[in-house]
Amino acid sequence: MKNIRNFSIIAHIDHGKSTLSDRLIQTCGGLSDREMEAQVLDSMDLERERGITIKAQSVTLNYKAKDGETYQLNFIDTPGHVDFSYEVSRSLAACEGALLVVDAGQGVEAQTLANCYTAIEMDLEVVPILNKIDLPAADPERVAEEIEDIVGIDAMEAVRCSAKTGVGIEDVLEEIVAKIPAPEGDPNAPLQALIIDSWFDNYLGVVSLVRIKNGVLRKGDKIKVMSTGQTYNVDRLGIFTPKQEDTTVLECGEVGWVVCAIKDILGAPVGDTLTHQHNSATEVLPGFKKVKPQVYAGLFPVSSDDYEAFRDALGKLSLNDASLFYEPETSTALGFGFRCGFLGLLHMEIIQERLEREYDLDLITTAPTVIYEVQLTNGEVVYVDSPAKLPPLNNIAEIREPIAECNMLVPQEYLGNVITLCVEKRGVQTNMVYHGNQIALTYEIPMGEVVLDFFDRLKSTSRGYASLDYGFKRFQAADMVRVDIMINSERVDALALIVHKDNSQYRGRELVEKMRELIPRQQFDIAIQAAIGNHIIARSTVKQLRKNVLAKCYGGDVSRKKKLLQKQKEGKKRMKSLGNVEVPQEAFLAILHVGKDK
């Protein structure tokens, strides 16, 4: 056991985590040169296309160190985006140490900090590593000082390497062996295995990634899931070398995968503890704190026949992604679907793409909203995650919106732009610290504003240099109203949105204009209106298509023309009372882009 090292690789987006993982695998001979490819751990097509890591992946490698011993390294490559930070905290729970990778050109960024603090809170040994020293812009001395100054860990001794060219990778491995402690645990105690991750395999059922904390797990053991009390047989177990390899036993302190022919998706929840059926452990291992979704959106299948398939797909996906929340929802405009909760907009995009690709579904998404706390006049407090569920205005005492605490690291020359952006988003500054050329800004900004397009705009006003990390802080009373969109004086529930009163006129007007461009012309006038309660704040009309009924009267009497026009007018009126308007998919997405084109 003293030769096992469990560690994660944490870093900001694009600081080279996945490339470093590739080099470690190559150096330790996990894959032959023929099987080696770039970002070998990013196995999903989506990850390859976007060049980001979404799911944490684990690998077991054997490394023969300079002291002649052979060490077993279990490491987990983690994502860098804010939206996937729960993946990082889950990975860290299975480790004793973490490699903090910092780009020697870019320096410390917000996510570096956030992930590092998560690791320190969990009492992990953090080993700083300066990556990309082959770049002309690299300045390892400055960055080492920055790490000490901002993060507060000693970085003068930090290993300098270049994951791309392979310089200094040996030193990284030696550093891991020297600095990261061996796992603690008792191989003779009752079995306790923590489920770090699960996914659904069509042939094997549920496959779980586990970390053995105490005891030993063998093939053929009878095991029990502690939260449900269900018992299963261990059919297969093994490790990833990145390929799935079968073994017969997982020793204390190891990380590996287990298949127990669990067919039920809820059979082995992530964060649960596995133990033996007979000599079972009494205590459950501390799991992970449940992540609360920050953004909610309705997902509806385009054709209602896909509803069942959609439900199964969501179930299988939520097994693999513990932070996805969903419940059934019906909408008059879109039929049956689900209200889903996500950690952020990127997470929402990824989930929608995975559903469309892996499960072959066509989906319509409604505009994302955050969750509001509503105090009713009778003293009751309700939580509203969709504009359609907002109680009538006269029953509401006050609406409280969620406030996010945003930590940003900004280079000095972009400070002005970033502050202007934060103020425009109704932000309140709470802190500002200078670290050399970088400035650490802390703002409290309403979650609804952060979620919409804050990240994109922050990147564009600072030319990509500012970085952001945010988390939910509290609910705070605000003057929020619901803007309804009416088409031919019928409310379309899927288009309603909750906005701050100051922005309501502007958002309503803009949305109505957008809808006018997107709704195709019909045989009759279509009135599109935005309303708060019964008060109309904006209107525009999609003009009707009409035939020129006077074409066949050459000259002729004016009363004849009047008669024909009158007849056409009555026909149109009848059509309007019977006709209903098709709202195209683009119109539902228009809400997302309101206010982006300025």
From Swiss-Prot:
Reading the lineage from the top rank, the first entry is: Bacteria
Q: What is its main location?
A: membrane
Q: Where in the cell is it found?
A: Cell inner membrane
Which reaction equation describes what this protein catalyses? GTP + H2O = GDP + phosphate + H(+)
Enzyme Commission number(s) of this protein: 3.6.5.n1
Q: Where does GTP bind?
A: 14-19, 131-134
Identify the InterPro entries for this entry: EF-4, EFG_III/V, EFG_V-like, EFTu-like_2, G_TR_CS, LepA_C_sf, LepA_CTD, LepA_IV
Function text? Required for accurate and efficient protein synthesis under certain stress conditions. May act as a fidelity factor of the translation reaction, by catalyzing a one-codon backward translocation of tRNAs on improperly translocated ribosomes. Back-translocation proceeds from a post-translocation (POST) complex to a pre-translocation (PRE) complex, thus giving elongation factor G a second chance to translocate the tRNAs correctly. Binds to ribosomes in a GTP-dependent manner.
- For this entry, the protein name equals Elongation factor 4
Taxon lineage:
Bacteria, Pseudomonadati, Pseudomonadota, Gammaproteobacteria, Pasteurellales
